[in-house]
Regions:
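Conserved class I S-adenosyl-L-methionine
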Residues: 1-41
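Class I SAM-dependent methyltransferase "Motif I" SAM/SAH-binding loop
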Residues: 47-49
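Class I SAM-dependent methyltransferase SAM/SAH-binding core
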Residues: 52-97
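A short acidic, Gly/Pro-enriched loop at the edge of an enzyme's catalytic core
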Residues: 99-106
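Residues lining the SAM
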Residues: 110-112, 143
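A short glycine-rich, Lys/Arg-flanked "PGG" loop and its adjoining helix->strand segment in the class I
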Residues: 124-136
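SAM-dependent methyltransferase
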Residues: 143-219
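C-terminal lobe and adjacent flexible extensions of AdoMet/dcAdoMet transferase-like proteins
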Residues: 211-258
């Protein structure tokens, strides 16, 4: 089987929601919602995936569109939307090639979606695309993660299991990661297994080398500055408190000038 050019496919996409569980109380949900309520609609959810934010906000009457580069994730989003009697505008595009029919008051890029841009030439291009898709005075809100700091181990691994509701099968996910300080890039290997009666009946491995780019707070702010954003602020995790120097998760917000 030829490996798709997008990261989320196959068992990884199928069991994405299962491993995330109930996300209704996640802090980022309330943070994004507060920004939308303050700065307005329409909204674009970049890297919308299976619709965690998109469908939630649509149910609240928010005018929001979604874009993702994975057809597998978008298909799952459509299935979930149909069950909720929702018809979202969904677009399959890569964010550095973003070309949508309308502009937005608020653009959200949840999770680590922006950090999946691995070619160093793509982040500034993508910031320009976001800028062009904002209405004058519109805002761009993105979280960032600093994946590694001096003294951290370079390698790590973990295993998680969940139960598939339909048949009681155990779904096991194992991940190995290695960080490269010289490039600020992380490699990952993810293995998904479906287990029934103590036997592995299906397995799929995803190798991404590299998989994710790490950003310091200074690098994230520079992206906004270089793209022409103004009123840039950096927040502690998913709060409106000022960022702390030691924060590994933080959100950046900036505005396209009027």
């Amino acid at each position: 089987m030829t490996t798709p050019s997008y990261e989320y496919y196959g068992l990884m996409a199928e069991f994405w929601d299962l491993f995330r569980g109930d996300t209704s109380t996640w802090e980022d949900r309330f943070f994004y919602l507060a920004n939308v309520e303050k700065f307005g609609q329409p909204v674009l959810d970049v890297g919308c995936g299976t619709g965690r934010i998109l469908l939630d906000f649509m149910q609240q009457g928010i005018d929001i569109d979604g874009v993702d580069n994975s057809p597998d994730m978008l298909a799952l989003c459509k299935q979930k939307a149909e069950k909720l009697n929702l018809t979202p505008n969904l677009y399959q595009q890569e964010m550095h090639k973003l070309s949508l029919p309308r502009k937005y008051q608020t653009i959200l890029v949840p999770s680590s979606s922006f950090q999946l841009l691995l070619d160093p030439a793509l982040p500034p291009v993508t910031m320009d695309r976001f800028y062009e898709h904002l209405l004058p005075g519109g805002t761009l809100v993105m979280p960032f993660m600093t994946l590694w700091k001096e003294g951290d181990p370079l390698e790590g691994e973990w295993t998680r299991e969940a139960t598939r509701r339909e048949d009681g099968a155990t779904i096991r996910r194992w991940q190995y990661s290695r960080f490269h300080p010289d490039t600020s890039l992380e490699d990952t290997i993810d293995r998904y297994e479906i287990i029934r009666d103590d036997k592995v009946i299906a397995s799929e491995e995803h190798r991404q080398s590299p998989a994710t780019r790490s950003y310091t707070q200074e690098q994230a702010v520079a992206l906004y500055q270089n793209a022409g954003f103004k009123g840039i602020r950096v927040f502690h995790e998913f709060t409106f408190d000022p960022v702390k120097p030691e924060d590994r998760t933080y959100c950046v917000r900036g505005f396209r000038p009027e």
